[in-house]
Amino acid sequence: MLQTSKEELYTARLKRYVTAMHLGLPDRVPLRPFAAEITARHAGFTCQEVTHDYRKAFEAIIRCCHDYDWDATVANMVYVWTGLTQAAGLKYYGVPGIDVPADVCFQYCEPADQTAFMKREEYDDLIADPVRFLYETWLPRVSSDFCERGQAVTFRNNLAFVKSSMAMMEYFTAFGPQVERMRRECGTVSAICGMLKAPLDILGDKFRGYVGLAFDLMEIPDKVQQACEALMPHLAYLALTGADPQREVPIPIWMHRGCTPFISKQHFKSIYWPTLKPIVEALWAQGNQTLFYAEGKWDAHLEDFATLPEHSIVYHLDRTTPERAHEILGRKFCLSGGVPNVKLAFAKPEEVRAICRKLIETIGAEGGYVMDASAIMQNDATLENLKAMTDATHEYGVYRSASSPTPAIPAAPTATAGLPDWITQAVPRPGVCCPWAEKIRELPPIQGDAQLAKRVWDDIEGLGYLYIWHLVLSF
């Protein structure tokens, strides 16, 4: 009986969430906290425990799902498993308990301009073959264990490859049972699936650093644009391979520094947006929504986002003005978030409740709104304010009219027929590192089923491809 009850709860929550994301009017405002280290505080764990042991991060989420009436949340919003990053020897993380105190969130340590992971003169190498560049140049620079090209291979080099790849497989495989546990034990929806980042954000985050990229935009913008174009097919491919097979929950894009004043409006319009918009459109053509997790203030770019197909995105409010976002985007796209993290950390619960009520009664008055904090909730938010946001949503978020039916999810094209040429005909092709056409020249004539040999080669090649790209995107 309990199993049936949880399944009914899950079905109702999923309908509520999907209805809102497709701009419908559900029975009430769905609640979807992107709760990271705050879950550790609720569960009695330290930041070190939920960052270095993903099983404890999973358990912290389950305890929150049990104790709060959330419609959806992320299976592990801490996400970066520092056991894996240590196995790969990654230099750019401050690990709780090792590099920073045990109850401090992990830190990303961007290198100085002089020690950037990609040098300015290496743009052509990245453009010519992104995957080869990642393995031969980028990986040895970001890791203390992997050897540079031309160096003698070491024991630590070989061990790092084996440990980190097996750790990645273990970690990603564990998400399936975690999502099922959320559904079975708590009736809670896993809020997102997959991952996307803008090409220009990747250049700044993992290759050139912000300072280096800023100078490149001013001095060699053509090379920056070519690099972004070279990354596009791979980022689109990665997003599609991780998307929800049912096309119910969105693919998130973590938008870091693509807004003014980090870059100029000119560079947004000439580089950032032209190399991101086609990816979002390609995902939508396959029936996948994208969650624009717009970190920072994006008011200057809302009109550009409004040119996307209706319902194709969910726009998340960090520091974007909620009223302006609703005016420009609210007729086409669902909005989410808007509860300032500083208020969740320092305000009294009554003030948090008032903020939630205002959001519901203004931008959420006609549906198409999902309650959440402005940014990922780390360990600075208080449990009292987390409860206040939850309770206020249930109290003020009930709509007067009956729930509208869940809108039909756009049908996905068969196979990859709907993918544009810039993905399917990219050279090198997304999804492989060493193409079969190259490998077959090293082999004797194939006997028996040649297509079987090619298929198995491509499938296993895909694992090597996913490994390096997830080091870039996920870790």
Feature locations, PLM:
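Catalytic cores of TIM-barrel enzymes
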Residues: 1-475
